[in-house]
Amino acid sequence: MKWSEIRFWGILFGFLLGALPLLAQDALPEKSRPDCHSGHVSDSEAMQQLMRFVEVSNPMPASFKGTTENTIIDPTHELEPFWQKLSVLDRPLRIVHIGDSHVRGHVYPYIVRRQLEDDFGREAVLDMQVSYRTSGLAQETGAAGIVYHIVGVNGATCASFATPENIRQIIELNPDLVILSFGTNEAHGRRYSSAEHLAQMDNLLGELKKGCPQAVYLLTTPPGAYVRNGRRGARVINPRTKLVVKTELDYAASRELAVWDMYHVVGGERYACLNWSNGNYFQRDKIHFTQDGYILQGLLLHEAIIKSYNNYVETQLDGTWN
């Protein structure tokens, strides 16, 4: 894959020096196209200084089939308080990204973190190397800016993550935005139950909201994965992923939560796994991803975040936010 922005090599050089192999992180059974968002700018100089559009590129590989628009689904504007804080950015603005091994590997969320720091400044945190060996927690300086914490657990589901220790850690980080990336391990449960999954998400979100009333929440759907057809059978596309994604989307809609539907963005039931596989983004287990695969996922989430932020800025400048 050809990267048009040279800065990624600098970002990743330090990461790669300390990174461990990303194989088998879960305890499981086994070019850029312009996408710069511009719009009407107010004549008010103060408003222009406060509200600015952020340039972002589309990292989606041209070879990917069946993709959909890369946006955050948020019809009730649940993320508006976060966008407002981001537009002002007069203090440390804290994002906590939690999830399974896709998050624990640190590459995927670290790319989002570094991109947002490039967009909004990195003065709020110490410039420390992050790798699989290190903590994903940022070290704050006290200055205003983005603080992006990474808290992943190998093999985690919504149910297993919701321990008192994990909840307490998230609460102590005092987040303004919590990103929840689960679903891969739920989909590997051969007795998957949508009703149980809904209850587990409700429990986790309930505990987080109780301890972090100031935060807003963004769900993400899993990228897709393969599963063995029998103990020694060939790997086939996991048929339960689509059920997990539907459950997560239904839950987000019923609870008025924002969601980034990565699964359908990269091709959905028909193409997601084929796109990852044909682009050599899967590791051998076809559950976890290569370095490039996780980089791409991070770039896609970053693009979706910036597009939503730019939409907020545009509507504020035009006075059309409803």
Spans of features found by a protein language model:
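Bacterial N-terminal signal peptides that target proteins for export
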Residues: M1-I11
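Conserved, well-ordered alpha-helix/loop/beta-strand core segments that scaffold catalytic motifs
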Residues: I179-G183, D202-L205, K209, V216-T221, ...
